[in-house]
Amino acid sequence: MEGAELKKFYETHLESGAGVSVLTADAPNPFGYGRILRDSVGRVTGIVEEKDASEAQRKIHEINTGIYCVEMPLLFTLLENLSNDNAQGEYYLTDILAECLKRGRDVCGIKTQDFDMVMGINSRRQLAQAQRVMNERIVGRLMDEGVTIMDPSTTFVEKGVKVGRDTVLYPFTLLEGETEIGEDCVIGPNVRFTNVTVGHGSSIQFAYAHDCRVGNGVTMGCFNHLRPHTVLSDHVKVGNFVEVKNSTVGEGSKLPHLQYIGDSDIGSGVNMGCGTITVNYDGKEKHRTTIEDNAFVGCNSNLVAPVTVGRGSYVAAGSTITKNVPEDALAVARGKQVNLEGWAKKHREK
Protein backbone atom coordinates (compact mmCIF):
# COMPACT_ATOMS: atom_id res chain seq x y z
CA MET A 1 0.00 0.00 0.00
CA GLU A 2 1.33 3.41 -0.95
CA GLY A 3 2.03 6.02 1.72
CA ALA A 4 -0.16 8.55 -0.07
CA GLU A 5 -3.17 6.26 0.33
CA LEU A 6 -2.53 5.82 4.05
CA LYS A 7 -2.22 9.58 4.45
CA LYS A 8 -5.52 10.10 2.65
CA PHE A 9 -7.18 7.49 4.87
CA TYR A 10 -5.83 9.16 8.02
CA GLU A 11 -6.92 12.64 6.96
CA THR A 12 -10.41 11.41 6.08
CA HIS A 13 -10.66 9.79 9.50
CA LEU A 14 -9.78 13.07 11.23
CA GLU A 15 -12.31 15.00 9.15
CA SER A 16 -15.07 12.51 9.98
CA GLY A 17 -14.71 12.85 13.75
CA ALA A 18 -15.36 9.11 14.07
CA GLY A 19 -14.01 7.05 16.94
CA VAL A 20 -12.97 4.27 14.57
CA SER A 21 -12.41 4.29 10.81
CA VAL A 22 -11.97 1.16 8.71
CA LEU A 23 -10.59 0.98 5.20
CA THR A 24 -12.83 -1.11 2.95
CA ALA A 25 -12.80 -2.31 -0.65
CA ASP A 26 -15.04 -4.17 -3.08
CA ALA A 27 -13.54 -7.62 -3.70
CA PRO A 28 -14.27 -9.51 -6.95
CA ASN A 29 -14.27 -12.70 -4.89
CA PRO A 30 -14.90 -11.86 -1.22
CA PHE A 31 -14.51 -15.45 0.04
CA GLY A 32 -12.44 -15.58 3.21
CA TYR A 33 -12.73 -11.87 3.99
CA GLY A 34 -14.75 -10.21 6.73
CA ARG A 35 -17.80 -8.42 5.27
CA ILE A 36 -18.70 -4.81 6.00
CA LEU A 37 -22.22 -4.40 7.38
CA ARG A 38 -24.07 -1.15 6.73
CA ASP A 39 -27.49 0.11 7.68
CA SER A 40 -30.15 1.43 5.31
CA VAL A 41 -28.46 4.83 5.03
CA GLY A 42 -24.99 3.38 4.44
CA ARG A 43 -23.46 3.78 7.89
CA VAL A 44 -21.09 1.02 9.02
CA THR A 45 -22.65 -1.09 11.77
CA GLY A 46 -20.03 -3.82 12.06
CA ILE A 47 -17.91 -6.51 10.43
CA VAL A 48 -18.84 -10.17 10.20
CA GLU A 49 -16.22 -12.85 9.55
CA GLU A 50 -16.69 -15.48 6.83
CA LYS A 51 -17.42 -18.36 9.21
CA ASP A 52 -19.93 -16.32 11.22
CA ALA A 53 -21.73 -14.78 8.23
CA SER A 54 -25.22 -15.70 7.06
CA GLU A 55 -25.89 -16.63 3.44
CA ALA A 56 -27.11 -13.09 2.76
CA GLN A 57 -24.05 -11.54 4.40
CA ARG A 58 -21.70 -13.75 2.38
CA LYS A 59 -23.09 -12.17 -0.78
CA ILE A 60 -21.72 -8.79 0.30
CA HIS A 61 -18.65 -7.80 -1.75
CA GLU A 62 -17.46 -4.92 0.44
CA ILE A 63 -14.72 -6.38 2.61
CA ASN A 64 -12.61 -5.42 5.61
CA THR A 65 -9.00 -4.69 4.60
CA GLY A 66 -7.73 -4.98 8.19
CA ILE A 67 -6.58 -1.34 8.22
CA TYR A 68 -8.04 0.83 10.98
CA CYS A 69 -7.57 4.27 12.47
CA VAL A 70 -8.56 4.53 16.16
CA GLU A 71 -8.04 7.03 18.94
CA MET A 72 -5.56 5.40 21.34
CA PRO A 73 -7.47 5.93 24.63
CA LEU A 74 -10.65 4.68 22.99
CA LEU A 75 -8.87 1.64 21.53
CA PHE A 76 -7.80 0.31 24.94
CA THR A 77 -11.31 0.79 26.29
CA LEU A 78 -12.81 -1.11 23.36
CA LEU A 79 -10.32 -3.97 23.66
CA GLU A 80 -11.24 -4.55 27.30
CA ASN A 81 -14.79 -5.45 26.28
CA LEU A 82 -14.11 -7.94 23.49
CA SER A 83 -15.60 -11.44 23.68
CA ASN A 84 -14.64 -14.73 22.02
CA ASP A 85 -18.26 -15.84 21.61
CA ASN A 86 -18.06 -16.77 17.91
CA ALA A 87 -17.60 -19.79 15.61
CA GLN A 88 -13.82 -19.53 15.83
CA GLY A 89 -13.66 -19.09 19.59
CA GLU A 90 -11.33 -16.15 19.02
CA TYR A 91 -11.16 -12.50 19.99
CA TYR A 92 -11.92 -10.48 16.85
CA LEU A 93 -10.35 -7.05 16.55
CA THR A 94 -13.20 -6.27 14.17
CA ASP A 95 -15.62 -6.29 17.12
CA ILE A 96 -14.27 -2.91 18.22
CA LEU A 97 -16.58 -1.33 15.63
CA ALA A 98 -19.71 -2.58 17.38
CA GLU A 99 -18.25 -1.65 20.77
CA CYS A 100 -17.52 1.84 19.48
CA LEU A 101 -21.12 2.28 18.32
CA LYS A 102 -22.40 1.12 21.73
CA ARG A 103 -20.55 4.05 23.27
CA GLY A 104 -22.26 6.51 20.96
CA ARG A 105 -19.25 7.14 18.75
CA ASP A 106 -19.45 6.99 14.98
CA VAL A 107 -17.69 4.40 12.82
CA CYS A 108 -16.50 5.58 9.42
CA GLY A 109 -16.09 3.17 6.51
CA ILE A 110 -13.70 4.60 3.93
CA LYS A 111 -13.70 2.68 0.67
CA THR A 112 -10.69 2.48 -1.63
CA GLN A 113 -11.26 1.87 -5.33
CA ASP A 114 -8.07 -0.17 -5.63
CA PHE A 115 -8.66 -3.67 -4.27
CA ASP A 116 -5.27 -4.90 -5.49
CA MET A 117 -3.59 -2.49 -3.09
CA VAL A 118 -5.27 -4.03 -0.03
CA MET A 119 -5.78 -7.67 -0.95
CA GLY A 120 -5.28 -10.14 1.86
CA ILE A 121 -2.44 -12.68 1.73
CA ASN A 122 -3.36 -15.96 3.39
CA SER A 123 -1.92 -18.46 0.91
CA ARG A 124 1.02 -18.83 -1.44
CA ARG A 125 -1.30 -18.26 -4.37
CA GLN A 126 -2.39 -14.93 -2.90
CA LEU A 127 1.23 -14.05 -2.15
CA ALA A 128 2.17 -14.68 -5.78
CA GLN A 129 -0.78 -12.58 -6.92
CA ALA A 130 0.24 -9.69 -4.66
CA GLN A 131 3.84 -9.90 -5.89
CA ARG A 132 2.61 -9.78 -9.49
CA VAL A 133 0.51 -6.69 -8.80
CA MET A 134 3.38 -4.93 -7.06
CA ASN A 135 5.82 -5.80 -9.83
CA GLU A 136 3.43 -4.50 -12.48
CA ARG A 137 3.29 -1.16 -10.68
CA ILE A 138 7.06 -0.93 -10.28
CA VAL A 139 7.89 -1.76 -13.91
CA GLY A 140 5.06 0.51 -15.03
CA ARG A 141 6.61 3.40 -13.13
CA LEU A 142 10.01 2.65 -14.68
CA MET A 143 8.53 2.71 -18.17
CA ASP A 144 6.86 6.04 -17.39
CA GLU A 145 10.31 7.33 -16.39
CA GLY A 146 11.86 6.36 -19.74
CA VAL A 147 13.06 2.79 -19.21
CA THR A 148 12.34 0.31 -22.01
CA ILE A 149 11.12 -3.04 -20.71
CA MET A 150 10.78 -5.57 -23.49
CA ASP A 151 8.39 -7.86 -21.59
CA PRO A 152 7.03 -6.52 -18.29
CA SER A 153 5.52 -9.90 -17.41
CA THR A 154 8.97 -11.57 -17.28
CA THR A 155 10.94 -8.67 -15.79
CA PHE A 156 11.07 -8.49 -12.00
CA VAL A 157 12.14 -5.37 -10.12
CA GLU A 158 12.04 -4.76 -6.38
CA LYS A 159 10.82 -1.47 -4.97
CA GLY A 160 14.18 -0.03 -3.91
CA VAL A 161 15.79 -0.46 -7.35
CA LYS A 162 16.69 2.55 -9.53
CA VAL A 163 17.06 2.39 -13.33
CA GLY A 164 18.19 5.29 -15.53
CA ARG A 165 16.49 6.66 -18.63
CA ASP A 166 16.89 4.92 -21.99
CA THR A 167 18.10 1.72 -20.37
CA VAL A 168 16.64 -1.47 -21.89
CA LEU A 169 15.66 -4.43 -19.71
CA TYR A 170 15.27 -7.71 -21.57
CA PRO A 171 13.14 -10.66 -20.39
CA PHE A 172 14.05 -12.65 -17.29
CA THR A 173 15.90 -9.78 -15.69
CA LEU A 174 15.64 -9.75 -11.88
CA LEU A 175 16.80 -6.62 -10.03
CA GLU A 176 16.84 -6.87 -6.24
CA GLY A 177 17.79 -4.94 -3.12
CA GLU A 178 19.52 -1.59 -3.60
CA THR A 179 20.52 -2.22 -7.21
CA GLU A 180 21.04 0.93 -9.27
CA ILE A 181 21.41 0.87 -13.07
CA GLY A 182 22.62 3.93 -14.97
CA GLU A 183 21.35 5.42 -18.21
CA ASP A 184 21.65 3.91 -21.71
CA CYS A 185 22.39 0.41 -20.46
CA VAL A 186 21.27 -2.91 -21.93
CA ILE A 187 20.52 -5.47 -19.22
CA GLY A 188 19.49 -9.04 -19.98
CA PRO A 189 18.17 -11.38 -20.96
CA ASN A 190 18.63 -13.70 -17.98
CA VAL A 191 20.32 -11.36 -15.52
CA ARG A 192 20.01 -11.33 -11.73
CA PHE A 193 21.47 -8.40 -9.78
CA THR A 194 21.32 -8.04 -5.99
CA ASN A 195 22.73 -4.82 -4.50
CA VAL A 196 24.67 -4.02 -7.66
CA THR A 197 25.61 -0.58 -9.01
CA VAL A 198 26.05 -0.27 -12.79
CA GLY A 199 27.27 2.89 -14.51
CA HIS A 200 26.03 4.41 -17.75
CA GLY A 201 26.19 2.71 -21.15
CA SER A 202 26.99 -0.80 -19.96
CA SER A 203 25.76 -3.99 -21.65
CA ILE A 204 25.30 -7.15 -19.58
CA GLN A 205 23.57 -10.42 -20.41
CA PHE A 206 23.24 -13.90 -18.86
CA ALA A 207 24.91 -12.91 -15.57
CA TYR A 208 24.49 -13.14 -11.81
CA ALA A 209 26.04 -10.42 -9.67
CA HIS A 210 25.62 -9.43 -6.05
CA ASP A 211 27.11 -6.77 -3.78
CA CYS A 212 29.48 -5.34 -6.38
CA ARG A 213 30.06 -2.30 -8.60
CA VAL A 214 30.25 -2.09 -12.39
CA GLY A 215 31.49 1.05 -14.13
CA ASN A 216 30.53 2.91 -17.30
CA GLY A 217 30.71 1.26 -20.71
CA VAL A 218 31.33 -2.23 -19.34
CA THR A 219 30.42 -5.21 -21.52
CA MET A 220 29.68 -8.66 -20.13
CA GLY A 221 28.93 -11.72 -22.21
CA CYS A 222 27.23 -14.93 -21.17
CA PHE A 223 27.30 -16.99 -17.98
CA ASN A 224 29.33 -14.77 -15.68
CA HIS A 225 29.28 -14.50 -11.89
CA LEU A 226 30.35 -11.36 -10.03
CA ARG A 227 30.67 -12.12 -6.32
CA PRO A 228 30.76 -9.67 -3.39
CA HIS A 229 33.32 -6.86 -3.24
CA THR A 230 34.05 -6.98 -6.96
CA VAL A 231 34.67 -3.70 -8.77
CA LEU A 232 34.79 -3.49 -12.57
CA SER A 233 36.11 -0.10 -13.66
CA ASP A 234 35.01 1.76 -16.78
CA HIS A 235 35.18 0.00 -20.15
CA VAL A 236 36.15 -3.38 -18.75
CA LYS A 237 35.29 -6.34 -20.98
CA VAL A 238 34.15 -9.61 -19.43
CA GLY A 239 33.54 -12.36 -21.96
CA ASN A 240 31.93 -15.74 -21.29
CA PHE A 241 32.18 -18.12 -18.31
CA VAL A 242 34.06 -15.78 -15.98
CA GLU A 243 33.85 -15.65 -12.17
CA VAL A 244 35.23 -12.64 -10.29
CA LYS A 245 35.33 -12.48 -6.51
CA ASN A 246 36.58 -9.77 -4.14
CA SER A 247 38.66 -8.21 -6.90
CA THR A 248 39.22 -4.86 -8.58
CA VAL A 249 39.64 -4.74 -12.36
CA GLY A 250 41.12 -1.54 -13.78
CA GLU A 251 39.86 0.58 -16.64
CA GLY A 252 39.86 -1.03 -20.07
CA SER A 253 41.12 -4.42 -18.89
CA LYS A 254 39.84 -7.60 -20.53
CA LEU A 255 38.75 -10.91 -19.02
CA PRO A 256 37.71 -12.61 -22.25
CA HIS A 257 36.57 -16.09 -21.22
CA LEU A 258 36.94 -19.15 -18.97
CA GLN A 259 38.55 -17.49 -15.96
CA TYR A 260 38.46 -17.40 -12.19
CA ILE A 261 39.69 -14.13 -10.73
CA GLY A 262 39.68 -14.23 -6.93
CA ASP A 263 41.15 -11.81 -4.37
CA SER A 264 42.99 -9.89 -7.08
CA ASP A 265 43.96 -6.32 -7.95
CA ILE A 266 44.17 -5.92 -11.72
CA GLY A 267 45.40 -2.66 -13.20
CA SER A 268 44.23 -0.85 -16.31
CA GLY A 269 44.83 -2.09 -19.85
CA VAL A 270 45.48 -5.66 -18.73
CA ASN A 271 44.67 -8.64 -20.96
CA MET A 272 43.96 -11.95 -19.25
CA GLY A 273 44.18 -14.87 -21.68
CA CYS A 274 41.58 -17.61 -21.95
CA GLY A 275 41.71 -20.10 -19.09
CA THR A 276 43.80 -17.93 -16.78
CA ILE A 277 43.28 -18.50 -13.05
CA THR A 278 44.41 -16.65 -9.95
CA VAL A 279 45.19 -19.37 -7.41
CA ASN A 280 44.14 -17.63 -4.21
CA TYR A 281 43.64 -20.45 -1.68
CA ASP A 282 46.43 -22.54 -0.15
CA GLY A 283 44.10 -24.83 1.79
CA LYS A 284 44.08 -22.62 4.88
CA GLU A 285 44.13 -18.97 3.86
CA LYS A 286 43.28 -16.72 0.91
CA HIS A 287 46.04 -14.64 -0.72
CA ARG A 288 45.94 -11.73 -3.16
CA THR A 289 47.28 -11.47 -6.69
CA THR A 290 48.39 -8.13 -8.15
CA ILE A 291 48.58 -7.57 -11.91
CA GLU A 292 49.85 -4.12 -12.76
CA ASP A 293 48.87 -1.84 -15.65
CA ASN A 294 49.24 -3.05 -19.25
CA ALA A 295 50.40 -6.54 -18.33
CA PHE A 296 49.61 -9.41 -20.72
CA VAL A 297 48.86 -12.85 -19.32
CA GLY A 298 48.81 -15.70 -21.86
CA CYS A 299 46.19 -18.44 -22.09
CA ASN A 300 45.96 -21.25 -19.53
CA SER A 301 48.21 -19.58 -16.98
CA ASN A 302 48.07 -20.09 -13.22
CA LEU A 303 49.05 -17.18 -10.99
CA VAL A 304 49.76 -18.68 -7.56
CA ALA A 305 49.14 -16.05 -4.88
CA PRO A 306 50.62 -14.16 -3.24
CA VAL A 307 52.27 -12.95 -6.44
CA THR A 308 52.71 -9.74 -8.47
CA VAL A 309 52.90 -9.43 -12.24
CA GLY A 310 54.72 -6.18 -12.96
CA ARG A 311 53.66 -3.28 -15.15
CA GLY A 312 53.89 -4.00 -18.88
CA SER A 313 55.19 -7.53 -18.38
CA TYR A 314 54.21 -10.68 -20.29
CA VAL A 315 53.38 -14.13 -18.98
CA ALA A 316 53.82 -16.88 -21.55
CA ALA A 317 50.82 -19.11 -22.25
CA GLY A 318 50.65 -22.24 -20.13
CA SER A 319 52.84 -20.87 -17.34
CA THR A 320 52.39 -21.47 -13.63
CA ILE A 321 53.73 -18.34 -11.96
CA THR A 322 54.87 -18.67 -8.33
CA LYS A 323 57.34 -15.77 -8.16
CA ASN A 324 56.92 -12.06 -8.80
CA VAL A 325 57.38 -10.96 -12.42
CA PRO A 326 59.42 -7.74 -12.83
CA GLU A 327 58.18 -4.77 -14.84
CA ASP A 328 58.44 -5.22 -18.64
CA ALA A 329 59.75 -8.80 -18.25
CA LEU A 330 58.66 -12.03 -19.94
CA ALA A 331 57.90 -14.87 -17.53
CA VAL A 332 57.98 -18.44 -18.83
CA ALA A 333 57.22 -21.22 -16.36
CA ARG A 334 56.44 -24.41 -18.24
CA GLY A 335 58.16 -27.63 -19.24
CA LYS A 336 60.39 -27.54 -22.31
CA GLN A 337 58.83 -29.19 -25.36
CA VAL A 338 60.58 -32.33 -26.62
CA ASN A 339 59.70 -33.91 -30.00
CA LEU A 340 60.56 -37.62 -30.33
CA GLU A 341 60.48 -38.17 -34.07
CA GLY A 342 59.04 -41.47 -35.26
CA TRP A 343 57.78 -42.42 -31.78
CA ALA A 344 54.09 -42.51 -32.73
CA LYS A 345 54.69 -44.80 -35.73
CA LYS A 346 56.69 -47.26 -33.64
CA HIS A 347 53.98 -47.19 -30.94
CA ARG A 348 51.27 -48.07 -33.45
CA GLU A 349 53.30 -50.98 -34.85
CA LYS A 350 53.73 -52.70 -31.49
Functional labels for PLM-detected ranges:
Residues 1-41, 65, 69, 77-82:
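Conserved beta-loop-beta/alpha segment of the NTase-like Rossmann-fold superfamily
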Residues 15-20, 31-33, 41-44, 64, ...:
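Short coil/turn connectors at secondary-structure junctions
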Residues 148-332, 337-338:
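Structural signal for interior beta-strand "rungs" in well-ordered beta-sheet cores
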